[in-house]
Amino acid sequence: MSTENTIVALSTPPGRGALAVVRLSGPKSPDIVHKLTKTTTQLKPRVAQHLNLYKNGELLDDAVIIYYKAPMSYTGEDLVEISCHGSPFIVNQLIELCLRYGARLAQPGEFTRRAFLNGKFDLTQAEAVADLVFSQTQASHQAAIKSLEGTIGKEFAELRSKIIELITILELELDFSDHEIDTIPPQELSKSIDNILKINSKLLKSYSCGKILKQGALVPIIGPPNSGKSSLLNAFLNEERAIVTPYP
């Protein structure tokens, strides 16, 4: 997948609404906007501009356009967000024009993928974007926010740094063990290894907890017939989800 071309996609949910946002990212983004608006004025970064959109010389819509100049954008590339009226017809026409002027349709998640490749996110932050979008509870939301802030990524970076440091010490021991060079006491090496194992264990436990927060947990309610399993389920949900009867 090339990151040298320009991509376009609808950023807001599809369907009819008051507004829709079409996003462009890539080197041709400013030129495509100039063709859409029939203007040659240079776009001002991070300034909302009210401009008309044209198709075949006729007015298509009026829109608010914001230009984010590379590398100070979500993807790290030249990026443009076009806020137009949320008519499916207008959105489709606008995207077709962007394709005609040199863009291609973005693949699912490609904007975030480009942000990752351009160093705007680490991998845990990139995954956290999707986790945040699909979060359904306060706990899953907070976990996604924590990852998006880079907390998990910093812990992985710390683990990597300590492993590299340990490897360096061990290689030094192997290469210069026969020379009169002060070496690290075995107790210090053991302490470093224990520290690495503790960090690794913590990350493994956080993965298990995070998986439950993201995907939920399957909890069976088990018991003999007519022992109140359905009533217990309804009590947990605070609604009559399962059919119950007072008669055995």
Each predicted region: which residue ranges?
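Weak global preference for isoleucine
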Residues: 7, 32, 65-66, 82, ...
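Alpha-helical structural signal
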Residues: 29, 91, 113, 160-163, ...
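A glycine-rich (often HGG/GG-containing) alpha/beta subdomain
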Residues: 1-142, 146, 150
